[in-house]
Amino acid sequence: MISAAQLLDELMGRDRNLAPDEKRSNVRWDHESVCKYYLCGFCPAELFTNTRSDLGPCEKIHDENLRKQYEKSSRFMKVGYERDFLRYLQSLLAEVERRIRRGHARLALSQNQQSSGAAGPTGKNEEKIQVLTDKIDVLLQQIEELGSEGKVEEAQGMMKLVEQLKEERELLRSTTSTIESFAAQEKQMEVCEVCGAFLIVGDAQSRVDDHLMGKQHMGYAKIKATVEELKEKLRKRTEEPDRDERLKKEKQEREEREKEREREREERERKRRREEEEREKERARDRERRKRSRSRSRHSSRTSDRRCSRSRDHKRSRSRERRRSRSRDRRRSRSHDRSERKHRSRSRDRRRSKSRDRKSYKHRSKSRDREQDRKSKEKEKRGSDDKKSSVKSSSREKQSEDTNTESKESDTKNEVNGTSEDIKSEGDTQSN
């Protein structure tokens, strides 16, 4: 009745007897009433019904929809159902392996018994035959001796005994051959390496096919295949975390190598930048030194130029003053000579005029000193302005000033020559 109810549950569902208005029970795949072996593939209790290896009916739920829900869930092969299923299947295989070993032991024992049972009588018959043969040989020798002695009756009696022994020996030989033929005609058995059933060696192919298509043989074959498949799946599942860990480790190592190479590149870049900055600083220092040397050379040249210009200006001013004084002296001397020549009688007026001239000369000399100071200040100012000018303008100025100086010196020489001539003429006049 239980198997029929399970069959109806599988065909029509567990809620087959509920009324339309009654609430259906929603059972999840992880409920304890659900067969976990069926979720993993199949229930072993369904494989061996009505066989010698029948495991009895399974009282838990076998539902294909629940199995599909389990396969689609995120906890598939993570709850441990597959490992429990594998252990149960391995226990069934261990049991059938023990059955196969017992079958082999029984076959070996029966074969030993048969061989020992057949060999025992045969060996005894051989021994009897050998004894009879020895007796026959002895009796024949005795018969020959009796015949040579002329004892014919005794020899005939012994001859009858020899005939009886020969008949007995032939009987033993025929018995041994019969036992061997019976042993040869007995059927040979073997054990099936899958389910442990006994098979007849050389049996008809139809009976062999019936055995191979039987529930027991196919059930154990399915169990063996499922065990191998589950082992492979679980091995891959255990290798996946290791592979993920290995891939993660390799990724971390690659990232560390990339970071190390990046740090090395940054270090090289910083080193290159420092070297570039050092070279730039060195070039800046070189430019500053060259600039300072040029400024010192320009300053020294400008200082020397200012000194030369000051000396030239001073010389020019002195030469101009001398020329002016000489020209005044010449004018005064000439006027004095003319006045003396024209107005000799007015000596007193001349003296007065001379005194006035001397006073005016002193006044003019003071004004000249003031004018000279003013000009020197202006020259200093012009020198500061000249300091800002370029080297080429200063050189051009120098050339122009040199030419002016030469011209002025030539003028000065001419004036000096003229003054000397005037002095000579004045001396001649006074002497006259």
UniProtKB/Swiss-Prot annotation:
Parts forming coiled coils: 124-181
UniProt keyword annotations, A-Z: Acetylation, Coiled coil, DNA-binding, Isopeptide bond, mRNA processing, mRNA splicing, Nucleus, Phosphoprotein, Ubl conjugation
One BP annotation, GO: mRNA splice site recognition
PANTHER family the record matches: RNA-BINDING PROTEIN LUC7-RELATED
Biased composition (Basic and acidic residues): 234-287, 302-311, 368-414, 421-432
Alphabetized GO MF terms: DNA binding; mRNA binding
Function text: Binds cAMP regulatory element DNA sequence. May play a role in RNA splicing.
InterPro entries according to UniProt: Luc7-rel
Family note: Belongs to the Luc7 family.
Localization of this protein: Nucleus speckle
Glycyl lysine isopeptide (Lys-Gly) (interchain with G-Cter in SUMO1) crosslink, residue number(s): K424
Modification type N6-acetyllysine: residues: K231
Protein name, UniProt field: Luc7-like protein 3
Region Disordered, residue ranges: 234-432
Ranges of compositional bias, category Basic residues: 288-301, 312-367
Oligomeric form and interacting partners: May interact with SFRS1 and form homodimers. Interacts with JMJD6. Interacts with RBM25. Interacts with RSRC1 (via Arg/Ser-rich domain). Interacts with RRP1B.
Family annotation (Pfam families): LUC7
Top-level division of the source organism's lineage: Eukaryota
Chief location category: nucleus
Modified residues (N-acetylmethionine): M1
